[in-house]
Amino acid sequence: MDKFNPKKEKTVKKRALKVLTEISPTPLFSMLFLLHISQIATYLSLSDKETLNITVKTKQGGTDTCAGRYVYMHNLPSRFNEDLIKSCEAYIELRNKCKYLINSGFGPRILEEDHNHTTRVLTIETGSWYYTNQFMLEVIFREKMRHYECLTNDSSLSSVVFVPFYAGFDVRRFWGYNVKLRDELGEDLAQWLRERPEWRKMYGRDHFFVTGRVGRDFRRVTDQDSDWGNKLMRLPEFENITMLSIETNSRSNEFAVPYPTYFHPKSRTEVKRWQRQVTMMQRRYLFSFVGANRPKMEESIRGEIIRQCLASQGRCKFLDCDTSSKDCSDPVKVVEVFQDSVFCLQPPGDTPTRRSTFDSILAGCIPVFFSVDSVYNQYKWYFPKDRTKYSVYIAEEGVKKGKVSIEKLLANVSEEKISRMRNEVEKIIPKIIYTKPGEVGPEKIEDAFEIAVARVLERVSLFKMTRI
C-alpha cells in the first residue's frame, strides 16, 4: 500500500484556493467547498486500494439538502436536563419559573380575555403569543432541535453535536450554596462527554450547548463560596465547546443569541401579518422607558433617564417596573408601550443586555442604546453591522453628567431617517424570534434558532479546515 503523501494533498488544496479566488463565492460556500476539496485531496493521496468511506444520501432522487447541515443531539441522562425541571418546585430559586415551562418553554398562552384590549395590541387569534420567561431559552432550544429538519441519530453523518444540558437551571438552583454543589453537575457532564465516541472526533470543538443565562454565571474565577456562579466554562472540556447564551463575555467560544420574546409564530405569513400591523401603528410618544431605577448601582444612568422622561411633558412614556402593579410582567402592557413609541430607551440594567431590547424591536420601536455592550458587541449574527441603520447610540457619560438632553437629541432625528430606521427594525423581527417547532417548506422562517445553528455549522467547518 502506498503511503499518505502530504505534498500531493497540499498541491490539491492550493489549486482549490486559486479556484475560490477566481469565482468570489459567499463565505459559507467557501468553507463548504474547501472542506470538500480537502476530502478529495486526502483521497488522491491514498493508494487505489485505500478509499474513504463517504456516504452520500439522496432525497427523492435528488441531492441531500441536509449535506453539511446534519446535527446530532446527545441523549443525555435525565439528570442533566429533565430532572432539573421535574424537581423545579423543590428549589426555592426556581419556584417562580416553574409555571413558564409549559408549551415547550414558551409558557402559558396569552388569551383574549386576559385584557379588554388584547386584540388591539396583539394578533391574539393566531394563538402565538405567550407569557414567555426570559430565562427559558435552553428548554425552547432543545424542543426546536427535536424538530430540526437535519437532525440525525447517526453521529457519523453529523457536522456538529448539540448538548441539551440545562446549564441555567443547574446554576440557578444552587444560588448562594457552596462551590462544590454548584460545580458538581457540570464536572459530571464533562466526564460523561469525554467518554463518548463523538468526543474523540474533535475533542469538543464540534460540540455546542445553549443557556438562558448570561455568560458570567459560568465563569467563576475563584473557589470561594462568596464568588459568583459556577466554573462550567473554565473546565478544560468546556473551553473547547461553543456556548450560546443571552449575553456573552466576548470569549472566543461564546456567542450571544436573542432573549426569547412573547411572540412565537408558526409561519412566514403570520410574521408578515405582524410586520404590517407594526408598520401601521400610530405612535403617540417620541420615546419611552420600561424599567426600574437602580439607586444602589452608582454607575447606573437609569435615574437620570427616568428624570428626563418624566420632565418631557408627555413626549415620553415611563412604565415603572419598581412597583407592586406587576405591569412589566404583563406582555400586553409592555408591548403596548413599545407600539406607542417611536424610540425605546435601553440602558444597561444588572448586566449590559436586556430582554426589553428584543420586545421593543418586535413592536417596531427604534432602540436607543447607551452602551456598546448592550447589542453591538453581542448579537453580531442578528443585527446589521452599521448600527446607525436601526438604532441610536448615546454615550452613557454625557447622560450621567446631565450634558445630554435625550428628548432634544431624538426630536432632531428627521422623519425621513425615522422611516428608514423603522423599516430596518421591521426587517430584523423574523431574525430575533423563536418560532413554533416543526414548520418546513416555503412557510418556514429563518428565525433566531435557525440562524444560530447555521453559524455554529460555519464555525465548526472553519475548525475542520484548520485541522487538515
Curated annotation (Swiss-Prot):
It is found in: Golgi apparatus membrane. Residues 36-468 are lumenal. InterPro entries: Exostosin, Exostosin_GT47. One of its GO terms (cellular component) is Golgi membrane. Expressed in roots, hypocotyls, cotyledons, leaves, stems, petals and carpels. Keywords: Glycoprotein, Glycosyltransferase, Golgi apparatus, Membrane, Signal-anchor, Transferase, Transmembrane, Transmembrane helix. Belongs to the glycosyltransferase 47 family. This is Probable xyloglucan galactosyltransferase GT13. It comes from Arabidopsis thaliana. The lineage of its organism: Eukaryota, Viridiplantae, Streptophyta, Embryophyta, Tracheophyta.
